Amino acid sequence: CIRDRAKAAYDAGGMTIGVVPSKIEENGHVSQYLSVEIPCDNLSDRKDLMLLKSDVVVALPGGLGTLDEIFTVAASSTIGYHNKRVILYNINGFWNTLIALLDDLQQRGMIRGDYHRHIEIADSFEQLKQLLG
């Protein structure tokens, strides 16, 4: 889970930044492993702030929230709101089924253009570093 990743980064001396919706705060689910907490009203505000402050979005294995963030960034890029890209960090093939779905949608003509212009894939840490370089 994201909390485990934040703890590992925090414990290693890395900076961890959390964009925290008020509902998460109200429910007492804010990670204790944040170097910086940026409060926001809701998930839409969270995505807007993350997009505003990011150069690229690296998607680690995650659930529905991560999928929401991936597709928000990719979809808004396809229609010209920004030129930011998503990198799926495909640790142990985690994103393989999503990649297969995207390939199928591409083949069926449901995605205009090449989705790889907006969503890139890194199957290893070396590939991730290369894409970020």
Descriptions of predicted regions:
Residues 1-2:
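Short, small-residue-biased leader/transition segments that mark boundaries at the very start
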Residues 98-108:
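Short, aromatic/basic amphipathic alpha-helical patches
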Residues 44-80, 87:
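Active-site/ligand-binding-proximal alpha/beta "capping" segment
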Residues 19-54:
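Glycine-rich oxoanion-binding loops at beta->alpha junctions
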Residues 52, 56, 107-133:
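A charged, well-structured terminal subsegment
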Residues 19-21, 60, 76-100, 113-115:
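Short, acidic/small-residue loops that bind anionic groups at enzyme active sites
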Residues 6, 10:
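Anion (oxyanion) recognition and catalysis
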